[in-house]
């Protein structure tokens, strides 16, 4: 327990003697410094510290009471009060010519303060004030032997930056508030004090006084005298009730704004020689201030048009008030008032602008700046509204946030601005003097492009995020409909002929008579009349009923998905009946997840029955998903014809693979079908829980409908694969007909008499009445065309990268850089965008291909391709896929397509194609877009990068050498052919001769339904020594028609590069290698 002569430390509770100022254990000060104590330093503690013993003496004492030390003030200076713990330098005696200054009254604008200062009989020189202020900041006002702590008055060494006792800073960061600006809202005199009412100072407007009295000039003998310091008192007459506006940050002192000519005082009212009627003085004052502070202008304060001005409002009626009275600080928020609709406040610099102004007059910020919805990156510039924020700088002059971070203003010759702290450093300084940021970083940030690398996202996390954002929009729509008592109508897909999309004279178009909501629809199934409408009601695959549309590819995929009801529920974001008729469906269109908003108005006939797909027992999920898909592709008409694998990819967004069971009738030279490998893939897919479907009697097969129907099968129909079993060497599959009827009646069917007893009890073949049956694998291969596998991984990661297929080698080549952090299994899927839209100008399918390489990135991001690790087959389809197991490292994924390459420049041979539609121009105004979907079992990083023009040639050469057929034509020459399974032909020739040229002629004029990247089916080339070249790439043009390729190769050695007698004109390549094809077909060094 502490005695009378002891005190307890607030930090360590040690009992210290009463005369000790700090704790002897932890050196904590006896009294914890607080804000009120610091603020009172400028109000009531008007003492000066002794430079020798640090004792604080009253202002009236000329010598220290303790040690007798007498300071040596400047001539004519008086002891001044200590303001905020800093001894101000006494003002020097100014010798101004007589008549140079006049009495001046009015508001004096300071940093964050608006105070009214009485006239002092002379005008203070502003340059001298700036000099004094700068000297105070540099420490000129401190004693030479050290400095006094403004908190505990201890005299510290000159090199110390903080007090050694209390830890206080050498200089306080509080604003310097002169006594004249302090607010005393009400004066309450304590006991023993007599307050004398103060008369208004001369020069201030008061009762019966003019607001602007005429200025009087001083006489010739009038000498300037130092400003008289009024006797200090907390209740001095110089203290006026002036509120101190609360600023959002400390800023340099604002300049007095230029006064319009009509409101300017006469020249005799101010300092002589000051420029009148212009803002030149303010601009130069700002430049001098910035050069003195050595700080660059902040981005939000600098404008591209010049120096702007942010006024601090001369009236503070609407501002928050901070009152400093005695030992208290009182904060009074501004009282609420009626909103001011004549002005708006800038969100960036807080300047109030007129309502009609679309931009801030100070910083140029848009009136709507800062209002951006959460979601995908904005597609319009927030300032000018131009499409694509990347080229926005060319349309409105504004820069993106990434460019703002790289641009630092202003920089002067011989200086550079630090991007971290904005300090202006000398050009010879390699690091910032304040924060040590290297100067090299400035140059790197100027030329660096914004980072586009991103991590893959968990599949389930992505779905939950998309649903959360979609539900917020849905709730707003439903709330609006409820308030206005209306039902939702989707104006972007209106109930009309355009949404149906069939030709005007088509029978389907004519049968659509009306669009009805569920409560208005007549049910076509009699047993469902008493059922109530719902989105789901214990959904089953057999609930699906096809309508007039030929979209069985989609319904077959939906039936396969219905084997897992949880997957169907993930497709429907709105899972319960909505009285307002607004529903949301989440689909993956062309590899991109999209949440589609639709209403519940469905096309019906004149009897009120649904015409398109529906579900039994008055369920809406089939009709709503079909309508959402029709909206995505433009109309119901666009949903006709397709493959079940496309539907699975659209509904799940998962990687899908199709296994062909039959040889291609359009290309007999394709690789033979390996039934054992397909069986192994089906077994592993079943164990992994993947979805599987099978196409019966379609595609490449010649079908006899009567033969199929006699066996209980339906040709050109999709079945779901429920189970795959290998029982005692017998390969069996269990399938389901989505119709719920028509089952297989051959061997291993329910009524087959040769069932082994133990297998009948184990496999329980009793579902033929519901369309479920067992089938032997041999019969399955005989009657079915293909197997579609949907690899649904609920715990995998996914990333999707958009890009485009260049239509020539002169366009930038897009490559996706892939960073694998730990060993992972990856699936790649490449989708062509807009391949199904009915309104597309050129929606023909491309010959898609994926190539995965080991890669290295050198200095400057230079990409070097390594070994080929995986690839897909080149196929004219809506999407292709491949899978690979990758170790940690850097990889590059190249996506390519060639059958859309445009014709060469004028003056060169016209493009030559041998196809049924050779006369149709294939060049598209814009390169076709694509989406690369990356699925991985572990976290990976993806980044789209721009490769060199020759990267595509290097990728094709590595592919052909790795997977093509090798042919040694002659000594030192090697030819590589890639044709089987590649939807065309690729020919690469290698010349290993150290000195001789190799002349090669490739003739493919007898080919059919192919197009050449060279623009001609006949080429001649001269390959230099120790080089190799991609001679030609032939690509299948029409995917639904067969193609044939014949090629003849002639070659010879030559001492010169010219082709001589092979061409009419002297040259090394025919057709010539124009910039459009040189990047792909130019010779490459070995």
UniProtKB/Swiss-Prot annotation:
GO terms for cellular component: cytoplasm. One of its GO terms (molecular function) is zinc ion binding. Disulfide bonds: none annotated. A zinc finger (RanBP2-type) spans 3-32, 44-73, 143-172, 338-369, 412-441. The keyword Thylakoid does not apply. Widely expressed with higher expression in brain. Keywords: Deafness, Hydrolase, Metal-binding, Microphthalmia, Phosphoprotein, Protease, Repeat, Thiol protease, Zinc, Zinc-finger. GO terms for biological process: proteolysis. The modification Phosphoserine is found at residues 296, 335, 338, 1070. Residues 125-140 have a biased composition (Acidic residues). It is an enzyme of class 3 (hydrolase). Residues 111-148, 199-280, 299-321, 1064-1086 are annotated as: Disordered. InterPro entries: Calpain_cysteine_protease, Papain-like_cys_pep_sf, Pept_cys_AS, Peptidase_C2_calpain_cat, Znf_RanBP2, Znf_RanBP2_sf. Residues 487-793 form the Calpain catalytic domain. Changing residue 613 to L: In OGIN; uncertain significance. The active site is at residues 552, 717, 737. Pfam families: Peptidase_C2, Zn_ribbon_RanBP. Belongs to the peptidase C2 family. It is linked to Oculogastrointestinal neurodevelopmental syndrome: An autosomal recessive neurodevelopmental disorder characterized by growth deficits, microcephaly, global developmental delay, hearing loss, and microphthalmia and/or coloboma. Other congenital anomalies include imperforate anus, horseshoe kidney, and structural cardiac defects. Some patients have been reported with normal motor and cognitive development. This is Calpain-15.
